[in-house]
């Protein structure tokens, strides 16, 4: 098992490429589509970097995995699928998110049965990538549909585990994901994080985002479970649930909405597909007013 991480500095999002070296098959986790909201311009620099890597290594893409419907960047999953193949994977509870935002955006024709995605996962779902086993973990809290993916590699004789955690836990000096989106829950997030922290201390957690403190360190893509248990500023080992929930809810009240939440969510709940062109050939995003506090 090899994992290569690509950072989009604009949204501070990591796209990870999981590779089974024996079979040369791979999966891409949380791919980013570049979007300039002021100009209404999309571009593919991040996606092309990942595509170029996959091609240069002679890899076959099996899966494009979304850990959840992101609110901070648009997904490039359809673009990558068109270039490399692969199936788009999402947690089955995305249907709840679709139903909520279909109303907010007043989308008449948005299917809310998650049928836009190729593979739907739930707790315990298994994906096979060569000699690697990918197990889905339902980790609600940030949204009701969040999934983490635990990868197990037994090919070297000793079991090796890595987990793509999505928006659950961040670097130790950053803490945890917000829970104030529709159907988010600090109580659920605490329970989800405890499941991750119950893994062996040497398990590598692959982060979806990193937000280094100003004037501090470089971005990091991975953290060991043991380090999280010792140092996470929100939820280190021994943090009571009530204390975490109180902190998380109070902190969320101070946070502004992500700057790309409205463009991102309407695209990402539709498996990354952009709106269809109108009769003038132009695609348009919708911006509902006063719908998110």
Q: What is each model feature region?
A:
Residues 1-2, 184, 191-204, 208-293:
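Accessory terminal helices/loops
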Residues 1-60, 149-165:
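Conserved beta-strand hairpin/beta-sheet module of binuclear metal-dependent hydrolase folds
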Residues 11, 35-36, 69-74, 95-99, ...:
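Active-site environment of divalent metal-dependent phosphoester hydrolases
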Residues 18, 30, 68, 80, ...:
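Divalent metal-coordination and catalytic microenvironments
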Residues 29, 61-69, 88-92, 138-141, ...:
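Active-site neighborhood of phospho(di)ester-bond hydrolases with catalytic His/Asp-centered motifs
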Residues 151-214:
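A contiguous binding-surface segment within folded domains or other stable secondary-structure elements
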């Amino acid at each position: 098992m090899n994992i290569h991480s690509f950072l989009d500095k604009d949204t501070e999002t990591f796209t990870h490429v999981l590779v089974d070296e024996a079979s040369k098959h791979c999966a891409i986790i949380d791919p980013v589509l570049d979007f300039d909201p002021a100009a209404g311009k999309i571009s593919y620099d991040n996606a092309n970097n990942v595509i170029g890597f996959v091609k240069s290594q002679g890899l076959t893409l099996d899966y494009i995995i979304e850990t959840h419907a992101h609110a901070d960047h648009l997904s490039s999953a359809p673009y990558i699928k068109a270039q490399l193949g692969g199936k788009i994977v999402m947690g089955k509870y995305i249907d709840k998110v679709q139903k909520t935002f279909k109303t907010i955006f007043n989308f008449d024709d948005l299917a809310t049965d998650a049928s836009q995605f190729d593979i739907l996962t739930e707790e315990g779902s298994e994906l096979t990538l060569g000699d690697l086993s990918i197990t889905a973990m339902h980790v609600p809290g940030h949204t009701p549909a969040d999934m983490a993916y635990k990868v197990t590699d037994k090919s070297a004789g000793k079991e090796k585990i890595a987990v793509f955690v999505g928006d659950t836990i961040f670097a130790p000096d950053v803490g945890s994901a917000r829970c104030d989106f529709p159907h988010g829950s600090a109580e659920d997030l605490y329970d989800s994080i405890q499941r991750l922290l119950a893994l062996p201390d040497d398990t590598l957690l692959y982060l979806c985002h990193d937000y280094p403190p100003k004037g501090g360190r470089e971005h990091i893509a991975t953290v060991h479970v043991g380090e999280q248990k010792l140092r996470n500023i929100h939820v280190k080992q021994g943090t009571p649930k009530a204390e975490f929930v109180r902190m998380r809810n109070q902190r969320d009240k101070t946070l502004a909405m992500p700057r790309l939440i409205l463009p991102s969510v309407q695209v990402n709940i539709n498996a990354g597909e952009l709106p269809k062109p109108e009769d003038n050939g132009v695609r348009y995003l919708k911006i509902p007013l006063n719908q998110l506090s």
